[in-house]
Design a protein with these regions (language model features):
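Mixed-charge (Asp/Glu-Lys/Arg
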Residues: 1-44, 50-171
Length: 171
């Protein structure tokens, strides 16, 4: 045991780095997404961006992201949310997206460090309304088994659909 007065790195700082590495490796595995994530940063509201890229690696669409880590999400074994994973979403990012501070589509990622599963929510206007979060610091979200990235190609396809839908709405 050290008697040093030097500040120490927290377990949380290492866990944050691990969660970002897990997410970056997954998203960039096909070279169709390029990530720009920050760790140990003090930027309010979001943790970075990722870009969908075309065959020439030109950016096609940028998404903003919030990345949260959890030691282990527990699957509900009883009640109305049986089979789902409860997570307490912090609402500051939700409010940031709802207030249209950015026009980029927004994704809320939750990385389960024990299983290395990456859960995600696309924060569409409909999703934000359904979450009913205003005036609250957190809101419980019930992740379904289908709301984690089990196949990166499916996630890329869904991200492309989000981009095309947003593009059509803007025109």
């Amino acid at each position: 045991m050290s008697n040093s007065m030097i500040s120490k790195h927290s377990k949380s700082a290492f866990d944050e780095s691990e969660s970002i590495r897990i997410l970056e490796e997954l998203l960039e595995s096909t070279r169709e997404i390029k990530t720009f994530f920050s760790e140990n940063d003090r930027t309010p509201n979001y943790d970075g961006t990722f870009e969908l890229v075309n065959n020439e690696c030109e950016p096609v669409k940028q998404f903003i992201v919030q990345i949260k880590k959890v030691d282990k999400l527990i699957q509900n074994t009883k009640g109305k949310n049986i089979g789902k994973y409860d997570y307490s979403l912090k609402t500051n990012f939700l409010q940031y997206v709802k207030d249209k501070v950015t026009e980029c589509p927004a994704i809320y990622f939750v990385v389960d460090l024990s299983t290395k599963k990456v859960f995600w929510i696309y924060l569409s206007d409909e999703t934000l309304m359904r979450l009913n979060f205003e005036g609250k610091k957190t809101v419980t979200y019930h992740f379904q088994e289908t709301e984690f990235i089990s196949d990166i190609n499916s996630f890329i396809l869904e991200s492309s659909r989000i981009h095309l839908k947003n593009h059509a709405l803007a025109n």
